[in-house]
Swiss-Prot record:
Gene3D superfamilies: Phosphoenolpyruvate-binding domains. It comes from Novosphingobium aromaticivorans (strain ATCC 700278 / DSM 12444 / CCUG 56034 / CIP 105152 / NBRC 16084 / F199). Its EC number is 2.1.2.11. Pathway: Cofactor biosynthesis; (R)-pantothenate biosynthesis; (R)-pantoate from 3-methyl-2-oxobutanoate: step 1/2. The active site is at residue 205. It is found in: Cytoplasm. InterPro entries: Pantoate_hydroxy_MeTrfase (IPR003700), Pyrv/PenolPyrv_kinase-like_dom (IPR015813), Pyrv_kinase-like_dom_sf (IPR040442). Catalyzes the reversible reaction in which hydroxymethyl group from 5,10-methylenetetrahydrofolate is transferred onto alpha-ketoisovalerate to form ketopantoate. Its cofactor is Mg(2+). This is 3-methyl-2-oxobutanoate hydroxymethyltransferase. 3-methyl-2-oxobutanoate binds at residues 67-68, 106, 136. It comes from the Bacteria.
Length: 289
């Protein structure tokens, strides 16, 4: 195949990337929230490839190389089987394809839970091999020691509370969290613990809205909602979800484009032309001079 990736700074429908800007830093993201208020919400989307990163970069503050790539890219049933090798490869691609957004790479299941030292070894590998700005890990109070261990050693960490997909087997499914008083209190406590440990931002996923608002008001770092509340300090979605690539998406997803229909339609037209021998035409073939 002849297609190659090349960073294109021209502005067009196919390459909507403007002239290069200075890459955002983690301190700049953290400073978005001052005195408990975020003047400009943080925009984050997932990215898994260099080309996808190029298209999203100018519009985002953060690009998340999520372990959701297990389902989205590899067709796995959950994010649990995702490996550190997979995250490193995709993380490096996203960093190569971006120049503005700070890139955050998920730490996959089994790469950080055993001990803070294991987490440091995994996180330092991701930073070295990808050039990313930070890592993200799931878990609440139990992970606070690990978050502090990493941040004290120069590795910025984004936390993740509420519905944590890596714990889907324990949670029993992808249901909204925080409906009971006890569960709500635990989620708020988890977020406080991560913030106190030095997390530069916290993803709040799949919780009832009052809990997301309470966390946002309680912690000094930015909160980034996904199925949480518009009152969070920022928002994140899986890019393929909001582009309509899947028939079934969580209820918190807004579909901005029917890209699945566009791709399927283009493939159908191509197939029709190949079978009718109308492609390639004169414009797509080389003729003698």
């Amino acid at each position: 195949m002849s297609t190659t990736f090349q960073l294109d700074t021209s502005t067009s429908r196919a390459n909507p990337t403007p002239a290069p800007m200075k890459r955002l830093t983690i301190p700049a993201i953290r400073q978005r929230k001052k005195d408990g208020v975020t003047a400009q919400p943080v925009v984050m989307l997932t990215a898994y490839t260099a080309r996808q990163a190029q298209l999203l970069d100018a519009h985002c503050d953060l690009l998340l190389v999520g372990d959701s790539l297990g389902q989205v890219i590899y067709g796995l049933p959950s994010s649990v089987p995702v490996t550190l090798d997979m995250m490193a490869a995709h993380g490096a691609a996203v960093v190569r394809g971006s120049y503005h957004a700070a890139v955050v790479v998920d730490m996959p299941f089994g790469s950080y839970e055993a001990s803070p030292q294991q987490a440091f070894e995994s996180a330092s590998r991701l930073l070295k091999e990808t050039g990313c700005a930070a890592v993200k890990l799931e878990g609440g109070e139990a992970m606070a020691e690990t978050v502090a261990f990493l941040t004290n050693r120069g590795i910025p960490v984004m936390g993740h509370v509420g519905l944590t997909p890596q714990a889907v087997n324990v949670l029993g499914g992808y249901n909204a969290r925080g409906r009971s008083e006890a569960e709500a209190a635990k989620i708020v406590g988890d977020a406080r613990s991560l913030a106190d440990a030095g997390a530069f931002a916290i993803v709040i996923e799949g919780v009832v809205e009052p809990i997301a608002i309470a966390i946002t008001q309680a912690v000094a770092c930015p909160t980034i909602g996904i199925g949480a509340s518009a009152q969070c300090d920022g928002q994140v979605l899986v890019t393929e979800d909001m582009l309509g690539m899947f028939e079934r998406v969580p209820r918190f997803v807004k579909i901005y484009e029917d890209l699945a229909g566009t791709i399927s339609g283009a493939a159908a037209r191509y197939a029709d032309e190949v079978r009718a021998r109308t492609f390639p035409g004169i414009e797509q073939t080389y003729q003698p001079k």
